[in-house]
Amino acid sequence: MNRLKEKYLNEVVPALMSKFNYKSIMQVPKIEKIVINMGVGDAVQNPKALDSAVEELTLIAGQRPVVTRAKKSIAGFRLRQGMPIGAKVTLRGERMYEFLDKLISVSLPRVRDFRGVSKKSFDGRGNYTLGIKEQLIFPEIDYDKVNKVRGMDIVIVTTANTDEEARELLALLGMPFQK
């Protein structure tokens, strides 16, 4: 069993139970899924850019991403409906915990001038979104093979009803929030 999942079951659940006075263990918020999205704007002019993005996302997530397509045509961006413009991957279960563990303990500390992640990025429904400016912070990405620095969005979806519960859950799991 994953180290983070073990920590969740043995330490986080009892701590949250006592803090928020839940009646049942099923009320304790848990992480449902993690969605990693990579928008590749230059895929419009250069379709090969998408292939490298998909490859990098596969390495990062350990799972093959799905290619996202344009919903509408936008003339200003020379975009037609249905053109591939990005990639996203949804992690659940073991892979999700492995990714989160790696993100918290290895990748985030590698960000330049890292002072912690923002406390304001909750959406009011107990989900947390975090943007990453470059994919090089992940240990799986080989610096020499990268042709372009790309960012990505990471959404952590929890079953928490309020932001406060979600913040507490992530903080207990080790998410480095700003002081």
From Swiss-Prot:
GO cellular component annotations of the record: ribonucleoprotein complex; ribosome
Family per record: Belongs to the universal ribosomal protein uL5 family.
Protein's UniProt keywords contain Membrane: no
Protein name: Large ribosomal subunit protein uL5
InterPro entries: Ribosomal_uL5 (IPR002132), Ribosomal_uL5_bac-type (IPR020930), Ribosomal_uL5_C (IPR031309), Ribosomal_uL5_CS (IPR020929), Ribosomal_uL5_dom_sf (IPR022803), Ribosomal_uL5_N (IPR031310)
Coiled-coil ranges from the UniProt annotation: none
SUBUNIT field: Part of the 50S ribosomal subunit; part of the 5S rRNA/L5/L18/L25 subcomplex. Contacts the 5S rRNA and the P site tRNA. Forms a bridge to the 30S subunit in the 70S ribosome.
Record gene name: rplE
